[in-house]
Amino acid sequence: MSGRAKQGGKARAKAKSRSFRAGLQFPVGRVHRLLRQGNYAERIGAGTPVYLAAVLEYLTAEILELAGNAARDNKKTRIIPRHLQLAIRNDEELNKLLGRVTIAQGGVLPNIQAVLLPKKTESHHKSQTK
């Protein structure tokens, strides 16, 4: 024997969250805990909370991007509920998904019925044909 003592075993690796491993911002561990506590099923697979967190993160990012565009169109730098309402109702798929959802302080979409708009005059058109 060389008489030299071992320098110790492997150091414990720094803990990595499941959100970090999946490359997500949404908390996979919290989603898993909520699925278990909600009694949705007797058993919850390991991939289920990852998938659900990814779906929630995608939908949130999509809505926030459209709401940010609506805020920028209104020359604002802060997203308010009105911008969320405009973003969701102007997007066909999001409107279908969130059709029965009421957004507090969201207002309504501006919409004027075609019959209420002023009639186009024919006098301008007739003068050009002569």
Curated annotation (Swiss-Prot):
N6-glutaryllysine carried by residues: 96, 119-120, 126
Superkingdom to which the source organism belongs: Eukaryota
Chief location of this protein within or outside the cell: nucleus
Modified residues (Citrulline): 4
Modified residues (Phosphothreonine): 121
SUPFAM superfamilies: Histone-fold
Segments carrying motif [ST]-Q motif: 127-128
Gene3D superfamilies for the chain: Histone, subunit A
Similarity-based family: Belongs to the histone H2A family.
Comment on protein domains: The [ST]-Q motif constitutes a recognition sequence for kinases from the PI3/PI4-kinase family.
Functional note: Core component of nucleosome. Nucleosomes wrap and compact DNA into chromatin, limiting DNA accessibility to the cellular machineries which require DNA as a template. Histones thereby play a central role in transcription regulation, DNA repair, DNA replication and chromosomal stability. DNA accessibility is regulated via a complex set of post-translational modifications of histones, also called histone code, and nucleosome remodeling.
Assembly with partners or alone: The nucleosome is a histone octamer containing two molecules each of H2A, H2B, H3 and H4 assembled in one H3-H4 heterotetramer and two H2A-H2B heterodimers. The octamer wraps approximately 147 bp of DNA.
Protein name: Histone H2A type 4
